């Protein structure tokens, strides 16, 4: 393929696309330049057909540290497993692309985005999304319509397309939108209690820019005109599907309408598969008739796939035509809510939130700021003091499964809940703790990420974290008939509705506005009118859940748990930091040892955080540090400890060195008239009262020994 270069025009940002130069053994390769950000996207698909009921699409986003001129900090000094940002970006691109693939295409596809150079103000995520879409467009893969993504910020009531890092820091809205030139396909956002109307306006604003990027890609596609893979479903397979549907339609419908539709559908599927196993398959090999294992296996796979299609068709039909949900709820009805706090006595805060058959147990741990998470990627190193971890064990869905490292899904769900809560957390100066929340999903039947939001909010308030407001979340679903444009919006979708539906819109927020949002589609875009209705329906449900939560706990507790560490922050002059640390950490280690292992964190700006489980120990440590950094003054009296005696080179006694506190020492001179022999009057380790009489130009201090009954000013 000859090298071809294309560049956007009449856009805020300039994208340059190079095709035909790099990685030429793949089905499609794109090098995207976005100012100094460079991303290589490669796409490969398997020619081997699969008998699956889903698309085995894998999207990988990987950052090479040389892209930012950095050497990896790991022991091996090379990139290792994907970090959270890489995983989340991979999911972001996957969720944007997946709705655009036709149902008939089920061959394995792998799209890899490698960041080769990074300018932090020009996001590699956008370049990766453009490269992923374009590589699919110019390949044989049946991907027919371009998608693009943009970021939107909001500063001083004005929307900004693809804001810089500095602009994002001042923005009340962090919105990522992906879509085609016709519709939106994916939304991801977190915000500072932004209203539904502002969100909708921002999405519409983003889509105007998306259209231009999609047209840019389609113009490139026309120059390549790739031959696309077509539908290979044969007439015999269509006939087989029709016969299966006719035979089992009434049984499936009855199972869906039962009181326990999930279990009844599973039992019916197993019953039908058992019947399919009885079907004999034989083949002839060298005049001998033998059992055809491969044909038998394919028959079972086909039967299971057809059952899934039929149950999906019948569930959708009931919702669309008869407005009947599998569990008989109304379209806007929320499942039964239950919540309680303080389940775990030794955790610093805990809560259990149950919505129908979905249940989250959240536990809060408070720690010192030095326990915050260090994020070291392509951008500058950052400290993250709030973490929310989501665990989805196999028993939550009644299954046997492997326990491994957190999956991409678990990381994604945890991050969404983390974004929702982080908007209402107190500032570090007001609550100087590292906060970790863990959500254990004990039961799951849809919307477990939003149950996590609710449980986490309750647990944080119970732990004494002064949240600005309570946060709740809920998922809204959609069933859309593309032939008739009929649709039904469902509040608080359960697992079956999520599986057969066309949208999963998760919205979390307070009673004032939205703090986090995520939308995934299974159809090729959603009309703006439907999106508007879904937002309003989600708000109604969220307010209902917040009202329920307020009956369990309405305000954050005024104090942290008795098992949580107590912390005090003090501000000192940065030049005084060395007085606390001492040479080689000598002084700070002495403080820690003499104060029951107290934790002390010192920031470069002079903030000192003292933490211990006992409040009195914290107060004593703070008082001691204050004495360390005090400016010694002439004429002021102090308590001092005798450290040693000094003699001159001839061995003649000069005086005694007294220490007010580590780092502040002075001389009690032998010439003071009261001394006959200083060693008879003073003993090493003895505490005496002294008065500062002189500080010379070199900072050396002279003390006057006071009578024992003198009341010192400072102790």
Swiss-Prot record:
Uppermost EC category: transferase
A Pfam family: RNase_PH_C
Cell compartment(s), UniProt: Cytoplasm
Keyword Iron: no
EC numbers for this chain: 2.7.7.8
Segments forming domain KH: 565-625
Main location: cytoplasm
Family: Belongs to the polyribonucleotide nucleotidyltransferase family.
Known function: Involved in mRNA degradation. Catalyzes the phosphorolysis of single-stranded polyribonucleotides processively in the 3'- to 5'-direction.
Name of the coding gene: pnp
Domain (S1 motif): residue spans on this chain: 635-706
Descriptive protein name: Polyribonucleotide nucleotidyltransferase
Matching SMART domains: KH, S1
Biological processes, Gene Ontology terms: mRNA catabolic process
Binding, Mg(2+): 498, 504
Catalytic activity field: RNA(n+1) + phosphate = RNA(n) + a ribonucleoside 5'-diphosphate
Cofactor: Mg(2+)
GO molecular function, one term: RNA binding
Gene Ontology terms: cellular component: cytosol
NCBIfam families, alphabetized: polynuc_phos, PRK11824.1
Assigned keywords, A-Z: Cytoplasm, Magnesium, Metal-binding, Nucleotidyltransferase, RNA-binding, Transferase
Record bears the keyword Chloroplast: no
């Amino acid at each position: 393929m000859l090298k071809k270069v294309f560049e956007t025009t009449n856009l805020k940002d300039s994208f340059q696309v190079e095709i035909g130069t790099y990685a030429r053994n793949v089905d499609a390769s794109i090098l995207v330049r976005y100012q100094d950000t460079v991303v290589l996207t490669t796409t490969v698909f398997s020619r081997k057909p699969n008998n699956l009921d889903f698309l085995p699409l894998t999207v990988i986003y990987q950052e090479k540290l040389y892209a930012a001129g950095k050497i990896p900090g790991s022991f091996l000094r090379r990139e290792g497993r994907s970090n959270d940002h890489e995983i989340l970006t991979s999911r972001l691109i996957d969720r944007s692309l997946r709705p655009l693939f036709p149902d008939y295409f089920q061959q394995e596809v792998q799209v890899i985005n490698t960041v080769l150079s990074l300018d932090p103000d020009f996001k590699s995520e956008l370049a990766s999304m453009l490269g992923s879409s374009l590589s699919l467009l110019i390949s044989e893969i049946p991907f027919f319509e371009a998608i693009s993504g943009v970021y939107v910020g909001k500063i001083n009531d004005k929307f900004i397309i693809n804001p810089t890092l500095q602009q994002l820091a001042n923005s009340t809205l962090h919105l990522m939108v992906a879509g085609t030139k016709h519709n939106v396909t994916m939304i991801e956002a977190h915000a500072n209690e932004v209203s539904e109307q502002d969100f909708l306006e921002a999405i519409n604003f983003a889509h105007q820019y998306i259209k231009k990027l999609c047209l840019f890609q389609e113009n490139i596609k026309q120059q390549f005109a790739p031959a696309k893979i077509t539908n290979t479903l044969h007439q015999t397979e269509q006939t087989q599907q029709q016969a299966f549907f006719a035979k089992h339609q009434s049984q499936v419908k009855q199972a869906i309408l039962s009181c326990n539709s999930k279990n009844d559908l599973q039992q019916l599927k197993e019953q039908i598969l058992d019947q399919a196993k009885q079907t004999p398959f034989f083949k002839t090999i060298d005049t001998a008739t033998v059992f055809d294992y491969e044909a038998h296996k394919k028959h079972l796979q086909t039967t299971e796939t057809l059952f899934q299609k039929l149950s999906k068709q019948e569930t959708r039909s009931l919702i669309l035509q008869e407005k009947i949900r599998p569990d008989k709820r109304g379209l806007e009805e929320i499942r039964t809510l239950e919540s309680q706090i303080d389940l775990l006595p030794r955790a610093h805060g805990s809560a259990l939130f149950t919505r129908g058959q979905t249940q989250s147990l959240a536990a809060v741990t408070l720690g010192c700021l030095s326990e915050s998470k260090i994020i070291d990627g392509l951008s500058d190193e950052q400290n993250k003091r709030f973490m929310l971890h989501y665990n989805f064990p196999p028993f939550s869905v009644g299954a046997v499964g492997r326990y491994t490292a957190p999956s991409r899904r678990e990381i994604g769900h945890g991050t969404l809940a983390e974004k929702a809560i982080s908007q209402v957390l107190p500032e570090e100066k007001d609550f100087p703790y590292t906060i970790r929340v863990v959500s254990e999903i004990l039961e799951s039947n849809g919307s477990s990420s939003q149950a996590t939001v609710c449980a986490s909010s309750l647990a944080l308030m119970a732990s004494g974290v002064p949240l600005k407001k309570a946060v709740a979340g809920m998922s809204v679903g959609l069933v859309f008939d593309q032939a008739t444009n009929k649709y039904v919006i469902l509040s608080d979708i359960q697992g079956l509705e999520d599986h057969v539906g066309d949208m999963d819109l998760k919205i979390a927020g307070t009673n004032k506005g939205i703090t986090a949002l995520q939308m995934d589609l299974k159809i090729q875009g959603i009309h703006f009118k439907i999106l508007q209705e879904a937002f309003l329906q989600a708000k109604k449900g969220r307010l209902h859940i917040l009202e329920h939560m307020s009956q369990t706990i309405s305000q954050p507790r005024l104090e942290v748990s008795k098992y949580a560490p107590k912390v005090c922050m003090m501000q000192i002059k940065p030049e005084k930091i060395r007085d606390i640390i001492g040479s080689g950490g000598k002084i700070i280690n002495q403080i820690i040892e003499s104060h029951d292992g107290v934790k002390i964190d010192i920031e470069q700006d002079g903030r000192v955080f003292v933490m211990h489980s006992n409040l009195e120990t914290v107060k004593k440590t703070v008082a001691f540090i204050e004495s360390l950094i005090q400016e010694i003054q002439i004429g002021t009296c102090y308590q001092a400890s005798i450290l040693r005696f000094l003699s001159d080179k001839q061995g003649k006694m000069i005086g005694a060195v007294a220490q007010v506190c580590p780092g502040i020492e002075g001389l009690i001179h032998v010439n003071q008239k009261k001394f006959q022999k200083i060693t008879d009057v003073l003993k090493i380790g003895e505490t005496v009262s002294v008065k500062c009489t002189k500080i010379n130009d070199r900072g050396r201090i002279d003390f006057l020994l006071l009578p024992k009954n003198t009341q010192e000013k400072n102790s």
